[in-house]
From Swiss-Prot:
Organism superkingdom: Bacteria
Catalytic activity from the UniProt record: RNA(n) + a ribonucleoside 5'-triphosphate = RNA(n+1) + diphosphate
GO terms for MF: DNA binding; DNA-directed RNA polymerase activity; metal ion binding
BP terms from Gene Ontology: DNA-templated transcription
Organism: Fischerella muscicola
Protein role: DNA-dependent RNA polymerase catalyzes the transcription of DNA into RNA using the four ribonucleoside triphosphates as substrates.
Names of the cofactor(s): Zn(2+)
Matching PANTHER family: DNA-DIRECTED RNA POLYMERASE, DNA-DIRECTED RNA POLYMERASE SUBUNIT BETA
Keywords: DNA-directed RNA polymerase, Metal-binding, Nucleotidyltransferase, Transcription, Transferase, Zinc
Stated name of the protein: DNA-directed RNA polymerase subunit gamma
Amino acid sequence: EVTKPETINYRTLKPEMDGLFCERIFGPAKDWECHCGKYKRVRHRGIVCERCGVEVTESRVRRHRMGYIKLAAPVAHVWYLKGIPSYISILLDMPLRDVEQIVYFNSYVVLSPGNAETLSYKQLLSEDQWLEIEDQIYSEDSTLQGVEVGIGAEALLRLLADINLEQEAETLREEITTAKGQKRAKLIKRLRVIDNFIATGSK
């Protein structure tokens, strides 16, 4: 677990232990060499140094291990948000502008409209609109039930988790057969992204 905000020691130019680039967590910075230098060269492959706790392996494992970190709170990766095309926007079938409003905490998004007739799934709400609805929910004579609203990357994570990829792909294939022009191109683009997720087993 990363417990310190430090990155690299400015004197030794080595990653700080328990910091953001820690060799004990992510692997050695140099091929076949532990942090303290007790083990060097390929013949010590697979050994975990008893002094510094770093596994003697190739430094390229750092790239892989840094891609699988558990964060205290969800974050939206800028490549998938702002890249062209925006994969998050395509997957959620929402305009990029709306997705950005949620990520940057400018708008709330409806995760479940419950029994509220004025709300719909994925609808964006301003802070004032949400406060108004919240007042209605908590009033004594309220009939509103099951209304769920979110904001930030946590809300996006919930929306993405709600997607059944196989079912969505099947629906898109059916829609593509009857769609024409720009709408058809948009559906194909979305299907391609979903198929890639299914093929790689990504969730």
